[in-house]
């Protein structure tokens, strides 16, 4: 199994990230993708990934919350990081109209620029979309034939949005959100509709600790070592063998991010 979304640069992991990685290995997680969310965090993610060659990789990009920071100097930093061996995707980039920490216009500029960069460098994109599906798709579609792969990280959309993403050939990242009986039931019901070759699994650690995890860590902090729980639950809801699903989603991650 492969965790395609870990925020290992979070301050929550600052004191024990090495132990976090070791616990993931001991739990049977075979690889980790560390998420970059702005220029500084992308550098930190790349630095961490380089400490674990062949086990950790990273993305480099600017999250829509930080889109107001996008400028030529930031693009150059992202471009430079993208040339390093441990960086395998542009992102986390996209649109988030839920809280608009950056204006929609700023988000669209940063998103489009990063799609162009991914196309130029022939890198996959690691995507974020919240409350912005139609505009997200409008901006993404013109670039899809120029980009080797696209992953919708932490998908939480509805049935129509899932169908649209699947029809475009996007890979779908599923987190412990589906383990939340308060807000994840609708998405849980959609899990069997995702073709296995388009399914990826992730923790989004330290966030989104699965609510049905028992026992829960005293810290209430999510970690990649809990990915096996997500695999088990998703497999049960899809009526598939968890070992098989863990292997298939690991293969998918390595194919999408060209780690094979």
Swiss-Prot record:
Location in the cell: Cytoplasm
Q: Name one GO molecular function term.
A: 3'-5'-RNA exonuclease activity
For this UniProt record, the keywords arranged alphabetically read as follows: Cytoplasm, Exonuclease, Hydrolase, Magnesium, Metal-binding, Nuclease
Q: Does the keyword Hydrolase apply?
A: yes
What's its EC?
3.1.11.-, 3.1.13.-
Family annotation (Pfam families):
TatD_DNase (PF01026)
Q: Where does a divalent metal cation bind?
A: 92, 128, 153
Name the predominant localization.
cytoplasm
Which PROSITE patterns does the record associate with it? Answer: TATD_2, TATD_3
- List, separated by semicolons, the cofactors it needs: Mg(2+)
InterPro entries given in the database record:
DNase_TatD-rel_CS, Exonuc_TatD, Metal_Hydrolase, TatD-like, TatD-type_Hydrolase
Which EC class does it fall in? Answer: hydrolase
Which Gene3D superfamilies does the entry link to?
A: Metal-dependent hydrolases
GO CC aspect terms: cytoplasm
Q: Which residues form the signal peptide?
A: none
Q: What does this protein do?
A: 3'-5' exonuclease that prefers single-stranded DNA and RNA. May play a role in the H(2)O(2)-induced DNA damage repair.
The family assignment reads: Belongs to the metallo-dependent hydrolases superfamily. TatD-type hydrolase family. TatD subfamily.
Subunit-structure text: Monomer.
In terms of NCBIfam families, this protein maps to:
PRK10425.1
Tell me the protein's name. Answer: 3'-5' ssDNA/RNA exonuclease TatD
| Organism, as annotated | Yersinia pseudotuberculosis serotype O:3 (strain YPIII)
| Gene, per the UniProt record | tatD
